[in-house]
Amino acid sequence: MEVNNETMQKSKFGRICVFCGSSQGKKSSYQDAAVDLGNELVLRNIDLVYGGGSIGLMGLVSQAVHDGGRHVIGVIPKTLMPRELTGETVGEVRAVADMHQRKAEMARHSDAFIALPGGYGTLEELLEVITWAQLGIHDKPVGLLNVDGYYNSLLSFIDKAVEEGFISTNARQIIISAPTAKELVKKLEEYSPCHESVATKLCWEIERIDYSSED
């Protein structure tokens, strides 16, 4: 994708982390959405952080961002490299020890999070950063790219949890969803946390430092 510098829009985000499947899914709309999201990041001058794979939706979104001239950081556990890296890689690939380190590293380098359609791994990454936001570990926006209603059932489940008193009404606002990349990124730009955190980000950072110093 060639991008005219005059059409580029300045974003408040330097990097966005994208969670998505290592499969392409059965619908071409999922694949189109991955490419559209990559192109939207390029148009807004945003770099990509993702799971490092070159297959599935991961490969499509990373290739689109790379082809548009933006920086790509892929974070992948060493044990998954033979499975999720095929052919030529794009951008910067950072090998880590395990899945926990992968998620921490992706979060550390990102200003916001977006989940494309995906499976267990995508859901686990998504729910963890939502939980981190609720706990006050970060205040970064979290978005669902709800392609063809893929996440409708998940959103209904979360609304049920609110109805039954397991998630507060304010914490429900952590999750932002939209059907298109353009609309979703715009909503993320406008996001302002309105939920009450369990602890402040500073408290979490101090606890982490103190815990590490005991080793």
Swiss-Prot record:
Tissue expression from the record: Expressed in roots and shoots. Detected in root procambium, lateral root primordia, vascular tissues of cotyledons, leaves and stems, shoot apical meristem, axillary buds, young inflorescences, fruit abscission zones and basal part of ovules.
Family of this protein: Belongs to the LOG family.
> Listed GO cellular component terms?
cytosol; nucleus
Q: What does this protein do?
A: Cytokinin-activating enzyme working in the direct activation pathway. Phosphoribohydrolase that converts inactive cytokinin nucleotides to the biologically active free-base forms.
The record's pH note reads: Optimum pH is 6.5.
Entry-linked PANTHER family: CYTOKININ RIBOSIDE 5'-MONOPHOSPHATE PHOSPHORIBOHYDROLASE LOG4, LOG FAMILY PROTEIN YJL055W
Q: Name one Pfam family in it.
A: Lysine_decarbox
The alphabetized list of GO BP terms reads: cytokinin biosynthetic process
The UniProt catalytic activity note for this protein reads: N(6)-(dimethylallyl)adenosine 5'-phosphate + H2O = N(6)-dimethylallyladenine + D-ribose 5-phosphate; 9-ribosyl-trans-zeatin 5'-phosphate + H2O = trans-zeatin + D-ribose 5-phosphate
Cell compartment(s), UniProt = Cytoplasm; Nucleus
**Effects seen without this gene:** No visible phenotype under normal growth conditions; due to the redundancy with other LOG proteins.
Question: Where would you say this protein principally sits, based on its record?
Answer: cytoplasm
The EC category is hydrolase
Keywords assigned by UniProt? Cytokinin biosynthesis, Cytoplasm, Hydrolase, Nucleus
EC code(s) of this entry: 3.2.2.n1
Please report the name of this protein according to its UniProt entry: Cytokinin riboside 5'-monophosphate phosphoribohydrolase LOG4
Q: So where does substrate get bound?
A: E84, R102, K103, G119, Y120, G121, T122, L123, E124, E125, T131
Q: Does the keyword Signal apply?
A: no
Which Gene Ontology molecular function entries are recorded, alphabetically? Answer: cytokinin riboside 5'-monophosphate phosphoribohydrolase activity
